[in-house]
């Protein structure tokens, strides 16, 4: 347990602000923690949360991040190695080709759930559709956007989940 705390503290005290140094540092930490797609997650994080273009990430090796940006990056690394899902960190997941806001109030939509959309597309259209336990609202929203049902409702007993679903509408 102490080793983990020391490890986590050393992450927040990394001294370089150079983008390339930070990327290499993150990749090294992730590879040691068996995060298999760590390189891709780092790129996505830099694009989504620090608004860096892929060109900047791949070619501007001398770019210096501001201290605030560096701290965001290091916190991302810390959260990831502590097991927090990547989608919660960037507050985004893709479902059926559309980005949805997610946070710990909702489950991250599973790719397998997209099969429900495929089945409904073949069998529909329907007059009504009800998504019980709507969470992020992804299923109800995709059903509505694809005109699979004339009227779609999403229900959830969790008010925070309903806030997320409403935000995604």
Stretches found by the model and what they are:
Residues 59-61, 67, 71-148, 152-167:
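SAM-dependent Rossmann-like transferase core, predominantly class I methyltransferases
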Residues 2-90:
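N-terminal auxiliary segments of SAM/dcSAM-dependent transferases
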């Amino acid at each position: 347990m102490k080793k983990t705390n020391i490890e986590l503290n050393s992450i927040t005290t990394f001294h370089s602000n150079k983008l390339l140094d930070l990327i290499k540092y993150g990749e090294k930490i992730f590879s040691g923690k068996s995060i298999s797609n760590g390189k891709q997650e780092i790129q996505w994080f830099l694009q989504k949360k620090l608004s860096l273009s892929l060109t900047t990430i791949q070619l501007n090796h001398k770019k210096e991040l501001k201290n605030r940006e560096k701290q965001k990056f290091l916190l991302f690394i810390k959260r990831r190695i502590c097991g927090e899902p990547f989608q919660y960190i960037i507050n985004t997941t893709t479902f059926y080709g559309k980005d949805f806001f997610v946070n710990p109030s909702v489950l991250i939509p599973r790719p397998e759930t997209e099969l429900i959309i495929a089945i409904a597309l073949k069998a529909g259209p329907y007059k009504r559709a009800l998504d019980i336990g709507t969470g992020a609202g992804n299923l109800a929203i995709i059903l509505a956007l694809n005109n699979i049902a004339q009227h779609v409702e999403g229900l959830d007993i969790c008010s925070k989940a309903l806030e997320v679903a409403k935000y995604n509408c």
